[in-house]
């Protein structure tokens, strides 16, 4: 028989009490920096040591990064020591993504951002802010999909059946 478990226990170190479950959608697993400080999913800098941090989709962790000059970035994780990364283009251009791209990946976008098919007009500061917020929610969704090991294919590999996101801006009716 199936055991029903509140979804918050999948990502939280400590199961929530019944009166706290309504907040479970906002809670995610925390991570630990190499300095011992707690890192959260959206962090881009460790508040303890000041190092830049980012999410590594291939390792499913938020980790501190060490710049390697022209050779990209290295995660300060023993099991990822030889791996080189670079920032997602949506981070370098708009500061809306904290996921990394492996240096041997030809795509400029991370595994989450490359699923975008349409984004709003980014010449509007309002659209950039709304897009940042919806990208944050999408990255949480994609983290959950990856963590649960659910299969998915992007539209870049399957144009008709692959997963893709169309983020449209509201239009004013004049």
Q: Regions from the language model: what does each represent?
A:
Residues 2-5, 18-21:
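Short, low-complexity intrinsically disordered segments enriched in A/P/G/S/L with frequent Arg
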Residues 37-40, 53, 92-95, 101, ...:
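Cys/His-rich microdomains that often coordinate metals
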Residues 133-174:
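Auxiliary, metal-adjacent structural segments of Zn-dependent hydrolase domains
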Residues 50-60, 113-122:
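Short Cys/His-rich micro-motifs in 6-15 aa windows
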Residues 108-134:
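Fold-level signature of zinc-dependent metallopeptidase catalytic domains
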């Amino acid at each position: 028989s199936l055991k029903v478990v509140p979804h918050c226990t999948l990502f939280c170190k400590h199961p929530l009490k019944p009166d706290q479950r309504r907040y479970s959608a906002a809670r995610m697993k925390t991570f630990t920096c190499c300095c011992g400080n707690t890192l959260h999913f959206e962090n881009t800098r460790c508040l303890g040591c000041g190092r830049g941090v980012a999410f590594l989709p291939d390792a499913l962790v938020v980790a501190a990064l060490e710049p390697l000059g022209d050779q990209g970035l290295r995660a300060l994780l023993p099991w990822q020591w030889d791996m080189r990364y670079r920032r997602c283009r949506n981070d370098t251009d708009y500061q809306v993504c904290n996921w990394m791209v492996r240096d041997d990946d030809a795509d400029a976008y991370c595994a989450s951002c490359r699923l975008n098919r349409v984004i709003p007009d980014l010449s509007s500061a309002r659209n950039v802010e709304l897009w940042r917020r919806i990208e944050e929610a999408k990255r949480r969704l994609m983290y959950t999909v990856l963590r649960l090991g659910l299969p998915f294919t992007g539209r870049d590999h399957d144009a008709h059946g692959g997963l893709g996101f169309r983020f449209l801006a509201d239009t004013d009716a004049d």
